UniProtKB/Swiss-Prot annotation:
Localization per record: Cytoplasm
GO biological process, one term: prolyl-tRNA aminoacylation
Protein name per the record: Proline--tRNA ligase
One GO molecular-function entry: proline-tRNA ligase activity
Keywords: Aminoacyl-tRNA synthetase, ATP-binding, Cytoplasm, Ligase, Nucleotide-binding, Protein biosynthesis
Primary enzyme class: ligase
Amino acid sequence: MFFSKMLIPTLKEAPSDADIVSVKLMVRSGMIRKLASGFYELLPLGLKVLRKVENIIRQEMNSAGGQEVIFPLVFPKALWLETDRWNAYGKELFKLKDRKDAEFCLAPTAEEVVTDLIRKDIKSYKQLPVMLYQFGTKFRDEIRPRFGVMRSREFLMKDAYSFHADEADLEKYYKTMFDAYTNICIKCGFQFRAVEAASGVIGGSFSHEFMVLTDTGEEEMTWCSCGYGANSAKTECLKIEQSKEEPLPSEEIFTTDVCAIEDVAKLLNLSPKKFIKTMIYIADKKPVAVLVRGDYEINEIKLQTLLGADGMLLADEQTVISVTNAPIGFAGPAGLKNIKIIADLSVAELSNALTGANKKDYHLKNVNFKRDYNADIVADIRKVKRGDTCPRCKKEELKFSRGIEIGHTFKLGDKYSKSMNASYLDANGKEKFIIMGCYGIGVTRILAAIIEQSHDDDGIIWTNNIAPFEVVIVPLNYADEKTKETTEKIYKELSSKGLDVLIDDRDERAGIKFKDADLIGIPYRITISEKNLANGNVELKARRDGKDDAVRLFKPEGVVIELLKIFKK
């Protein structure tokens, strides 16, 4: 392949709206171009990398017993009504109508369509288990698309679904898929962690996220050397042992217009750890009071999961006033009536705490659990914070890292099969719901994640198996007969052995060619100059070696042997 014949529009500078390294380098190297907010065109170089990532994933899916399928990009509303996700999915769901006014959505995920397929064709336990997977374009109307293909409105995803007769079989297969995802991450050259995660709108009883470690990652995770790991939304928080104090008489304190915990703490010279923060939420249209220690935040994902609520949001001021008889900022658990109270583990044993008094400009001092208030549920509903102890070993302090989620695996159970009536007959002729697993991986997101983790000041550093080309041959004067002859001979010998080779035949200065090779991230560069050829040599440089002083000289036949050895051809 000749550089001059390909569309590789490299740029010296990145666009001003490119916000992270991967976007800058993907645009500058000619991999992508922006069409509109959240929509990108994948150019030849980008597509070559994408196909190589696809093949890595496909090999692992096939090894796990998967069968590849293709689903439409447009799904009928009727299927989404069966699972109640037509409205629950929110504004991210692209909706459209055809000329007959029938409603559809652009595929954001494929649980409904694959369950519909299976319920039509799987009738007996003898047909189970089965796993289907596809590479398909997905659409999500992100409120603020950013970070290039990392969080776009259109993206390529591999989604897989497994179907089982019982939970035990799902558990066994989930481990198979967990291992497959681990292998994909290793083959892509990632430094990564698989961590426990919240299941979100997909649902199910348990899930893992596969997180690529990078400071630019949107997700925060916690981990411990004992092996525990979770994203911050899922991280378990322990009951806090707190010093017992003799309960003191409760006392109202006038705090003028001060209501923020930090301000009240300063006014009364108290630590926020002595406060009980009381927040009023609306869960499935009913108010609920939620309590957490003053130095913690409420984890809304944990809270919604605990309540089993379809929808949840903070109450508006009018609702807060009707529940507490006070404006926002003065709520407290003592005296609340006709409302469910949920207390975090951090407050249940807090002695002589300070709370709002349910009265404007007043707080209540020396509030104690069971004496002054009770809770309907005491559970872990707080966000993890630095300094918290690992919930698994209960010894070490949790460590925090940031990462990019590139894969997510779920144990769905019968969430979709029950709502869509996907059942089978067991060995005794009894009808049972099919048990499901779900396994997604963002293919275009993997490209960006690799670049975020593997780049330098000069450009991208691809691994050998993913690079758009494995070798670039740079003849400094392609018009010279001997240079051209040597270039084409090396090209033919390497190509015949299966290597992906690019000849940079452009009439450009050597410096421009070298900069583009480094920018694109081609692992090995062969430079052919008249000067070196006069001595029977060509130059070989590995992209990962960095500076040009890492250049090695070889005979033309020797450089072929060396590269075939490196690539094990």
